[in-house]
Curated annotation (Swiss-Prot):
InterPro entries: ATPase_AAA_core, P-loop_NTPase
CDD domains according to UniProt: RecA-like_protease
GO CC annotation terms, alphabetical: chloroplast
Taxon lineage: Eukaryota, Viridiplantae, Chlorophyta, Mamiellophyceae, Mamiellales
Molecular functions per Gene Ontology: ATP binding; ATP hydrolysis activity; ATP-dependent peptidase activity
Identification of the protein by name: Uncharacterized protein OtCpg00170
Length: 1260
């Protein structure tokens, strides 16, 4: 087979599965007018040119142009909101088909030219390829914005839907948006100038690694010229090859320096064969290479537009200004721009190449496909290029009055009101009216870089964003601040009826011409909304197909939709389904790990991450139906306030965020305190009631937005990415509001919803141990944590380090490589083999290995220098027996978190059996005695329980019965017994044995639900990983009682515990969060079993405050105590807490009220911290000034405050603790000085007394 045919076959293989996916999966849910369009586009002949039987470009454009997806009999204005949404869904898939087909049709033109050139006898060498593709390269770079404008979006999207499993599409969402924005910027650079040192090479067979000096010089000469231009310090070359990253080395002839340039690949042909090509899915091995370098290259690509360079190009007249912004730009471009003189003049391929280019790249045809072909609207007065979102796009008729007002005086004769002229310039992701700009009015400052995806870690890569934008920051601030004073989010209509809209008909008429230009940048939302809309359409049809057509519940992917709309609303999993079986410990772990990547915390638990990362979900149908009901309940949160009739439920991404609403025109409390409205329905209702009862007080509240430094940051504010920076006069209602939403926020970190992404791995312990027998999911949980955190994962076996000669060297090399890729996760299996207790072994090699591990674990890994590294990594270790480990590994500061992965109990085994059987390819007999098999599998691990069903499936298929029976399950049970103990379970004599068991279960009404005997109030997930979400336990005191003394010594040396929180440099909102932590910390017991997690040094929320064991039993830590004590002093404390807030605005009444209620809050809380203290500890020595060895500090007001607390504690010394259901005797430390508490007897009681006392507090 020739090389050409092989390429064509590969292309065909890539494309056809998408058509099959649409036809098979969506079926009759998609209306199919002119369905032959897609069929023709996907023909093999089409990829080799229309001469081989495909449609001509004119026929294709006419067919697409005449297709009318909407009902022409109905006028757009007559459709209700529900009907509009229904039409969007009805034709969404057909729209996606056309867009993807158009994108691949255009890409095929480049391939066709290359194939034609190869057929003409051109030698397949690096020199020949470079010479013959140069015209295509330059043409591609010039026409990129219109010719391949959907390549970064639809091309990758289509590939994800075809080659990859469609369930993984959501993992590529971030990659798609970032890559799309980067490519658009490349297109703009090449469109404006020939000398910009950024080229797009679209040759499939072109070697990217010059192997000789001649090839290297040739590539430099053909692509960059004689030597690298000095206009750009960090040139990037896009190489349209596989989805991977490679490097190319180019030497500057002037300086003789060799530089590595990253190459970014996009085409799908070689993904499965190229080892460096990795999709955006967690692969756990080699992820560090892809994650770090690839995304950095994408980030670098997004900054290639230099404003000064563009200005110089225009000033020098390299390219005509009119041709850039004229709607007839494609018709004015001269084909001589391809510069064929660089081809070999001795060959006669030049003329034929010109003819091929003219034939395939007809500018009129390209423009037709770009503007008309993918426009889904039928009304001639409101079409626009790009995907049509119906009412969520810019209606030209609505803009005419606005434009007339701006331009009527002097520019009326230049206005051409044609729908095609008003189009989307995808090259920069901005909305611009090309027909309404003249040569003198174009301002290149409008080309502010548009970030495809904002990720904090990438900000300083290649360019300093502050200096990059500082040139126009002052002018933009002044201009845009004036704009914000005259309009609001509601007036812009960007969030009309809870749906992201771009209708501009409600714009304030007082806007100036410059402000209108700024307003056009809001069009940067369009690429994201389109990408979100495409995924959302597929998701909705997938959902409808599963639940209405096949009638078989299956796992549904819905989570990552909030990437596309780029809105801030993130629905926590515990808000959707209630209690998350992992408790707050896992929330904090996942939250901190994910913040290290700069992304928000969307779903802080394991379940749906396992779902998304292609691991076995094992979700039963009845549970999934229940989850769907809860999701719908959350989606209705804001929609029910804006529409009276809603037949369709919007996803979480479209929940409205009116962060900039005018307080005078918007009475909704959620618009001014949006950070409090991330709870569920009951929280919103309570806040609404509170607003009505405290309207006078709320009228004095004021929300001040921090002034933005750049125009695009303000645009992001309009998109819903605006964080709350300053809140004045808020403390007078803080405690009351916290009480109203306390129960709703009890299971989710408050700070996580307010300020995600601020703190990183330095707030975490260094490691966590996964303890349990093999087969209970230690590696499974490690993969789930890695997938949720989105961090590079390094997996290794501890046996690699047991080598006597190279073991220590390998260990040092491992930590060095991991820290070079920090932040990341290191997972070591059977870590107890390299952390043997040094007192129990005489082997010098094992002693040396354990010592070296501790040195590397603490960060002292660089040679012999005893200095710690600042690169943070999180170490996960799996161990079967923790008693074999060295006590030094379990002390505070190292492996502080321990997860015990126990064997499943009876209820879990029964549920796991039924769950696995329901997902097997065979049926289930209704007479199976599940209780019997659950009892007989006592002591089995989770893997062995699943193996019972697997063996039963094989038995059923072998007997050609295809049904699970009692006999087949019994065979599976026997196989496990035979393997473990070399014995079998006695078989039943006849069917009567199992029938009798089944009848007994029916009579006793035994339900197949999980039996949780630890805590009846807990409702964890019914899933395979429920046994993984066990509580974090403190193993160190249990196995090493002598560690308490050393731990106390460690705590004494922690100076951080002796200082109050310094909020002079922090935001006032964080003080609110900190107080909120104290308000809801007593709810921690609700999300964990009776044996709650106890850590040597734990952490609370994102503020990074050090807690301890006693605090988790109900105590505020030392820093919080000092902070709340400072609040009591209104003259010093408040100024200390935040020096940037003008506290003079708080009147005397508010200060007095805050002082009284803060003292009541603190004293009441502390009076119930301890149920019984030791006799020598009842005076709270080392804490309130009664220890003679403790030197008192602070004012007399502080001492009086301590005396009141001491008196309250004396009164409640022998009272039962009313807050927590605890049992057992627990020893621990408290604060930095260290003392012990002992709980003498079990404690019970709800959290009613404290809540009632707070609710009785009245504002004066």
């Amino acid at each position: 087979m020739t090389q050409e045919n092989n390429n064509s076959t590969n292309l065909k293989t890539v494309i056809i599965p998408f058509h099959e996916f649409i036809a098979n999966e969506l079926g009759n849910n998609c209306i199919k007018p002119n369905d032959e369009i897609l069929t023709v586009l996907l023909k093999r002949e089409e990829w080799e040119g229309h001469e081989d039987g495909g449609e001509t470009p004119t026929e294709l454009s006419d067919r697409v142009k005449n297709w009318q997806p909407y009902d022409a009999r109905k006028d757009r204005q007559q459709l209700t909101r529900v009907e509009q949404i229904q039409y969007q869904l009805k034709y969404g898939v057909k729209s996606l088909q056309l867009i993807l087909g158009q994108a691949f049709y255009r890409i095929s033109l480049v391939n066709a030219i290359m194939h034609r050139q190869y057929e003409q006898g051109v030698k397949v060498t690096s020199r020949g390829r470079a010479k013959n593709i140069l015209g295509v390269v330059k043409w591609n770079a010039t026409y990129w914005p219109q010719y391949l404008k959907y390549y970064g979006f639809s091309g990758i999207l289509n590939y994800c839907l075809t080659v990859l499993d469609y369930r993984r599409v959501f993992q590529l969402s971030v990659f798609t948006i970032a890559m799309g924005a980067g490519i658009m910027r490349f297109g703009l650079a090449q469109k404006l100038t020939k000398t910009q040192p950024t080229y797009v090479i679209s040759a499939e067979k072109f070697s990217v690694q010059p192997k000789s000096k001649s090839e290297q010089n040739l590539l430099m000469e053909k692509v960059f010229g004689k030597k690298l231009p000095k206009a750009l310090e960090n040139p990037i070359v896009l190489y349209v090859e596989p989805l991977g990253l490679t490097n190319i080395q180019l030497r500057d002839e002037g300086t003789k320096e060799i530089t590595n340039y990253p190459f970014i690949g996009l085409t799908p042909e070689t993904l499965t064969t190229h080892r460096s090509a990795r999709p955006m899915v967690p692969t756990y091995e080699g992820l560090e290479k892809f994650d770090a370098d690839y995304l950095k290259a994408i980030r670098a690509a997004s900054y290639l537009i230099d404003q000064e360079t563009l200005k110089n190009v225009i000033d020098t007249g390299t390219v005509s200004k009119n041709s850039i912004h004229s709607p007839n730009f494609f018709e004015k471009v001269d084909l001589n721009f391809f510069e064929y003189e660089e081809f070999d003049e001795k060959t006669d391929n030049n003329q034929s190449s010109v003819q091929e280019l003219s034939q395939f790249f007809n500018p009129k045809m390209i423009r037709t496909l770009s503007t008309e072909g993918i426009s889904l609207g039928t009304q001639p007065d409101w079409k626009m290029a790009g995907p049509k979102l119906q009412t969520n796009t810019l209606a030209v008729n609505d803009v005419y009055p606005l434009i007339d007002k701006y331009w009527s005086e002097s520019k009326a004769d230049q206005i051409h009101k044609t729908s095609a002229d008003f189009q989307l310039e995808n090259s920069v992701g901005k909305l611009t009216s090309a027909a309404y700009r003249t040569e003198s009015e174009f301002d290149f400052n409008d080309l502010e870089d548009f970030d495809g995806l904002e990720v904090d870690e990438w900000d300083d890569f290649y360019f300093d964003r502050k200096s990059f934008r500082a040139k126009t920051a002052e002018r933009e601030n002044e201009k845009f601040n004036e704009f914000l004073m005259q309009t609001s989010m509601d007036e812009l209509g960007l969030y009309k009826n809870g749906f992201p809209s771009l209708e501009l008909k409600r714009i304030n008429e007082n806007l100036t011409k410059e402000q209108f230009k700024d307003l056009e940048l809001i069009g940067g939302l369009l690429p994201s909304i389109f990408t979100w809309y495409a995924f959302y359409t597929l998701y909705q049809f997938r959902l409808n197909y599963i639940y209405n057509v096949r009638k078989k519940p299956e796992p549904i992917l819905y989570t990552r939709l909030d990437h596309f709309g780029r809105l801030q609303n993130k629905v926590k999993l515990n808000e959707v389904v209630g209690i998350d079986g992992g408790g707050e410990a896992f929330d904090k772990l996942f939250s901190a790990l994910q913040r290290a990547r700069g992304m928000g915390l969307y779903l802080p638990t394991v379940l749906l991450t396992i779902w998304e990362s292609s691991l076995s979900p094992l979700i039963p149908g009845e549970l999934d139906n229940w989850l769907l009901t809860q999701r719908n309940k959350v989606r209705m949160n804001f929609i029910k306030h804006t529409t009276s009739k809603v037949d369709f439920l919007m996803p979480e991404v479209t929940l409205a965020q009116k962060m900039l609403s005018d307080p005078d025109k918007t009475s909704g409390y959620e618009s001014r305190f949006h950070f409090l409205t991330h709870a569920v329905d009951s929280a919103i209702n309570k806040m609404d009631a509170f607003e009505k009862s405290n309207s006078k007080m709320l009228s004095n509240l004021e929300l001040t937005l921090q002034e933005s430094k750049t125009k695009m940051s303000k645009i992001r504010h309009l998109q819903g990415l605006l964080p709350i920076m300053k809140v004045k006069e808020l403390f007078k209602v803080t405690l009351k509001l916290l009480q109203l939403i306390e129960n709703e926020l009890s299971h989710s970190p408050v700070i996580s919803a307010l300020k995600p992404g601020r703190y990183g791995l330095n707030t975490l312990p260094k490691g966590m141990l996964l303890v349990g027998d093999p087969g209970n999911g230690r590696s499974f949980l490690a993969r789930a944590i890695a997938s949720e955190s989105r961090l590079p994962v390094f997996k290794t076996e501890s046996t690699r380090f047991l080598d006597v000669k190279f073991g220590v060297m390998r260990l040092m090399s491992l930590f060095r490589r991991v820290r070079d890729q920090a932040p990341g996760i290191l997972f070591i299996r059977d870590i107890d083999l390299i952390t043997i207790d040094r007192e129990r072994t005489n082997s010098p090699e094992l002693i040396q290995l354990t010592t070296q591990f501790l040195i590397c674990f603490d960060g002292y890994y660089i040679g012999s220098e005893a200095r710690p590294t600042q690169r943070k990594i999180f170490t996960l270790g799996s161990v079967s027996d923790i008693t074999r480990m060295d006590p030094a590994c379990l002390r505070s500061g190292r492996f502080e978190w321990v997860v015990n992965l126990r064997k499943p109990i009876l209820g879990e085994r029964k549920f796991l059996l039924l769950q696995k059987a329901s997902q097997s390819p065979v049926q289930i007999d209704a007479t199976i005695a599940w209780n019997y098999f659950g009892l007989m599998s006592e002591g089995f691990t989770n893997a062995e329980v699943v193996s019972i069903v697997n063996n039963s499936t094989l038995q059923a298929i072998r007997k050609n019965e295809f049904v699970h029976t009692n006999e087949s399950l019994n065979e599976g049970l026997n196989s496990i017994f035979q393997l473990r103990w070399n014995q079998t379970v006695s078989k039943a004599a006849d069917e009567g044995f199992f029938n009798e068991l089944h009848l007994s279960e029916v009579i006793n009404s035994n339900k197949l639900t999980v039996d949780y005997t630890m805590n009846e109030k807990e409702r964890p997930f019914k899933t395979k990983c429920m046994h993984l979400l066990t509580t974090v336990k403190n193993w160190s005191p249990k196995n090493n009682p002598t560690e308490i003394s050393s731990l106390r010594m460690q705590n004494i040396g922690m100076s951080i515990q002796t200082q109050p929180v310094d909020y002079s440099q922090e935001l006032i909102v964080e003080l609110l969060d900190f107080m909120a932590e104290g308000a809801f910390i007593r709810q921690l017991r609700r999300c964990s079993p009776a044996n709650t997690f106890v850590t040597q040094t734990s952490y609370s929320g994102q503020l990074g405050e050090r807690l301890n064991k006693t605090f988790l039993k109900g105590c505020l830590n030392y820093r919080m105590e000092n902070t709340l004590a400072l609040i009591e002093n209104p003259t010093q404390g408040l100024k200390t807490l935040s020096g940037t807030i003008s506290w003079e605005a708080l009147n005397k009444t508010a200060l007095k009220d805050l002082q009284q209620r803060t003292a009541l809050f603190t004293s009441w809380y502390k009076s119930r911290m301890f149920c019984q203290l030791k006799p020598d500890q009842r005076s709270l020595t080392n804490r309130y000034g009664y220890n003679p060895n403790y030197q008192q500090t602070g004012s007399s007001s502080m001492n009086r405050f301590k005396d009141r607390i001491k008196a309250r504690l004396r009164e409640s010394t022998h009272q039962a603790h009313p807050l927590y259901a605890m049992s057992g005797s627990i020893r621990g430390t408290f604060g930095s000085r260290g003392y012990e508490t002992r709980l003498q007897r079990p404690l019970t009681g709800p959290v009613t007394q404290m809540s009632q006392e707070f609710l009785n507090i009245q504002f004066k």
